[in-house]
């Protein structure tokens, strides 16, 4: 039996090499396409300007497209700079490899402007850099004063003055709404303000079927269903000999291998001890009342004995339904177990495909319906 971690790496690399780019960006005039839904999802963030990875440090509201970018950003809070300059006499350190490479270019450029102060060997590629160096390090002059009323601060360079003005005196619009209907909007200072605006003013909706969603991420997952068939979405194939199963997500494939081929049963019934590989199978076991462990029977108000308290609740519910005279037990059973139609209030999950009126109580059941019918 293969080790699970090694097998996961093998699965990932194998599918990356063989996968076809079948997931197309739904935005007009964008011809991007990808081999996996996750890559398409990552790309779509550049259209919606969605940055789900938010820094959780107190007072910091910066957000990023990718988790790796957030990880790099957090180094500025911990002051971890793993990339160091290798030039002799230079102790500069940086948060990223890109910043280090940019710094190294400074060493490689010619530096014709040398400081003439006694004992100073600094050289610079620009004359303005030399002037700023002399003001800050030798004459200690601060030639750039803040011109705002009641502010007496001065700075050695124009850039430091501008940074001060932006931070202390002027409202900086860092984020603007990407939707065309918001052209001319003044924008937002914080990422969180932009996200609140988008949630309230621009509810994500499918351009194909018109269905609305709570988040852009839910919409992206939905769009993929319109663009491909189920078989096209199943790009993750089980590598175990004799197994022809395939899946739409790598996580589903890993779970399949863990449960079916390695026999890992993480969920068990507290009453009878029966083990299950999937949580929904345990839930179904509990809902159906198939637990065979002997226990004291429960008696309801009608004097009827039941194997468990769940049986009492089911009986009482049936009595209530009969008294309401809405539908017969036979009709209810057909509706509940066969058609999936009706009882809109109790079935919050509806099929998103046009002309399909199926509704479901559980999200899991809706996914099974989509995979088998669409």
Swiss-Prot record:
PROSITE patterns: ZINC_FINGER_C2H2_1, ZINC_FINGER_C2H2_2. Keywords: DNA-binding, Metal-binding, Nucleus, Repeat, RNA-binding, Transcription, Transcription regulation, Zinc, Zinc-finger. Disulfide bonds: none annotated. The keyword Transcription applies. It comes from the Eukaryota. A zinc finger (C2H2-type) spans 23-47, 53-77, 83-107, 113-138, 144-169, 204-226, 236-261, 267-291, 349-374. Coiled coil: none annotated. InterPro entries: Zinc_finger_trans_reg, Znf_C2H2_sf, Znf_C2H2_type. It is found in: Nucleus. Pfam families: zf-C2H2. One of its GO terms (molecular function) is RNA polymerase III general transcription initiation factor activity. GO terms for biological process: transcription initiation at RNA polymerase III promoter. Gene3D superfamilies: Classic Zinc Finger. PANTHER family: C2H2-TYPE DOMAIN-CONTAINING PROTEIN (PTHR46179:SF13), ZINC FINGER PROTEIN (PTHR46179). Is required for correct transcription of 5S RNA genes by RNA polymerase III. Also binds the transcribed 5S RNA's. Initiates transcription of the 5S ribosomal RNA gene. This is Transcription factor IIIA. It comes from Schizosaccharomyces pombe (strain 972 / ATCC 24843) (Fission yeast).
């Amino acid at each position: 039996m293969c080790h699970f971690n090694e097998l996961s790496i093998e699965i990932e690399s194998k599918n990356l090499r063989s996968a076809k780019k079948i997931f197309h960006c739904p935005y007009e005039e964008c011809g991007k396409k990808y081999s996996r839904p996750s890559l398409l999802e990552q790309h779509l963030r550049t259209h919606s300007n969605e940055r789900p990875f938010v820094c959780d440090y107190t007072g910091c509201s910066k957000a990023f497209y990718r988790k790796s970018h957030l990880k790099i950003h957090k180094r500025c809070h911990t002051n971890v700079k793993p990339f160091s300059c290798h030039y002799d006499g230079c102790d500069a350190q940086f948060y990223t490899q890109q910043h280090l490479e940019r710094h190294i270019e400074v060493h490689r450029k010619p530096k014709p402007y040398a400081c003439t102060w006694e004992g100073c060997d600094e050289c610079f590629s620009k004359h303005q850099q030399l002037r700023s160096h002399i003001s800050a390090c030798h004459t200690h002059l601060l030639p750039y004063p803040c011109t705002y009323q009641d502010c007496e601060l001065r700075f050695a360079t124009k850039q430091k003055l501008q940074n001060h003005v932006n931070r202390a005196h002027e409202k900086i619009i860092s984020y603007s709404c990407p939707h065309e209907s918001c052209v001319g909007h003044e924008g937002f200072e914080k990422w969180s303000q932009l996200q609140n605006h988008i949630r309230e003013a621009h509810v994500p909706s499918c351009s194909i079927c018109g269905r609305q969603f709570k988040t852009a991420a839910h919409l992206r997952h939905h769009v993929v269903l319109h663009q491909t068939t189920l078989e096209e979405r199943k790009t993750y194939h089980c590598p175990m000999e004799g197994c022809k199963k395939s899946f739409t997500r790598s996580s589903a494939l890993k779970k399949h291998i863990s449960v079916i081929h390695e026999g890992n049963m993480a969920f068990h019934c507290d009453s009878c001890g029966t083990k299950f590989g999937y949580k929904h199978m345990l839930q179904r076991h509990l809902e159906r009342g198939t637990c065979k462990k002997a226990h004291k029977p429960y008696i309801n108000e009608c004097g009827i004995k039941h194997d468990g308290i769940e049986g009492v609740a089911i009986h009482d519910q049936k009595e209530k339904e009969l008294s309401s005279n809405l539908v017969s037990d036979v009709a209810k059973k057909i509706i509940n177990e066969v058609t999936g139609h009706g009882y809109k209030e109790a079935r919050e999950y509806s099929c998103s495909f046009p002309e399909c009126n199926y509704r479901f109580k559980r999200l899991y059941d809706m996914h099974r319906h989509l995979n088998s019918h669409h």
